[in-house]
Amino acid sequence: MRLWSWQLLPYLSDLQFKGQLREITAIMRDWRDKETTNHLLINRVMDYPKGDLTSYFLLYDIEYGNRYHKQHCELATEFVNFSKGDHFTVEPFKGWHNKEYLRVCMANLYEKHFFGIGKSRITDEEWQRLCDGYKTITGEEYKI
């Protein structure tokens, strides 16, 4: 389980992007129903207000609309109800989703590009899109 840096959402390959919806939804439902998450890579979400996870979902859903021209209205309602009036933010998980975390995400995505097999592999074109996105976000070329 992993939450990609919210800044990478517009640049993720379709496979990684669509998989992110399953991750966000599973995290929200575990937190809501079990009052906890149980995965090393995402447990930090609980250090933030629930509104940050809802904000992440809303940023995801905007990008989803840009890509596929539809939205997740029922799921959006579920997220808003989950956050129970917490404030939303345009930069969710501030302090965690920083440049260092962005680089960790890029390294993980590079591994999927370089070592990936079959459908899970990130193609050269998809990798270039991620590198271009990294440069847009940071103003720097991505270096491994």
In which residue ranges do the predicted regions lie?
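Sequence termini and other peripheral, non-core segments
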Residues: 1-144
